[in-house]
Amino acid sequence: MGELMAFLLPLIIVLMVKHSDSRTHSLRYFRLGVSDPIHGVPEFISVGYVDSHPITTYDSVTRQKEPRAPWMAENLAPDHWERYTQLLRGWQQMFKVELKRLQRHYNHSGSHTYQRMIGCELLEDGSTTGFLQYAYDGQDFLIFNKDTLSWLAVDNVAHTIKQAWEANQHELLYQKNWLEEECIAWLKRFLEYGKDTLQRTEPPLVRVNRKETFPGVTALFCKAHGFYPPEIYMTWMKNGEEIVQEIDYGDILPSGDGTYQAWASIELDPQSSNLYSCHVEHCGVHMVLQVPQESETIPLVMKAVSGSIVLVIVLAGVGVLVWRRRPREQNGAIYLPTPDR
């Protein structure tokens, strides 16, 4: 089980980070049911997150809800964990029944998955979002609209369930209240519990270097590491213009020390005199590394400290560093396949 969670948790983190806005805090619960699981895979798993931090886990092997963050264990009494353990044991059985029913409807056999995701987000301006959805075999199945108190069904099987669920007005109102009120209240409480971890800022250390990726092909790599929160924007510009279609991006990944790393690369045109610059934005600070045209080694390393850019090392050429504060405009909720309610 430990090996499986070691695989699942970073994967979910990567998915969340790729869609998150740095000004948003979120609480999400993911649940996964598996029919006919392979050896070592639990038939039911539940994981809770605040932002990209796992806070709770439950699985059908341990049959216990447990804290994944020390500040959760320190602030919630034993009866909390016991109460939600009992609820999740009920969810485990419910998932098993629902998955069997779906397999009958689809005439499926063998191993299949049923997923639930529920959560909420608190934006910097105080506004909130809430989301609840189900998936079958990794594909959207039912999506809740809390404003219209209705479910969006993706096929005829889902439509049958939609009709039954929408007939229960009390449950629809309960889900709406949980998303808009309870979830946000829990999120604010957890943010206070873990504020030293969740609300800190660690600026990125950014490097640019050249690398021969294939014989005769050279690329520029812009690498950022040691940053938190994990949301970061990186791009390359050629002669002052962004060239997204020419850029390769790496995923934003945990570094193992509570910080994150990411990279973006672009292939060099050896026949041109193009001027390349890497642009990195993190927590409102915008950094620019301009690459010296004749450099053959690592041209730049820099780090943002307390809202300003500090040149740490310059090798084989002089770089141009620019900084300014700029608000992020992108905004969006994260919809991933589950809550402990």
UniProtKB/Swiss-Prot annotation:
Its main location: membrane. Residues 110-201 are annotated as: Alpha-2. Changing residue 143 to V: In allele MR1*03. It is found in: Cell membrane; Endoplasmic reticulum membrane; Golgi apparatus membrane; Early endosome membrane. Residues 23-302 are extracellular. Residues 23-201 are annotated as: Antigen-binding cleft. N-glycosylated. Residues 202-293 are annotated as: Alpha-3. The alpha-1 domain is a structural part of antigen-binding cleft. This is Major histocompatibility complex class I-related protein 1.
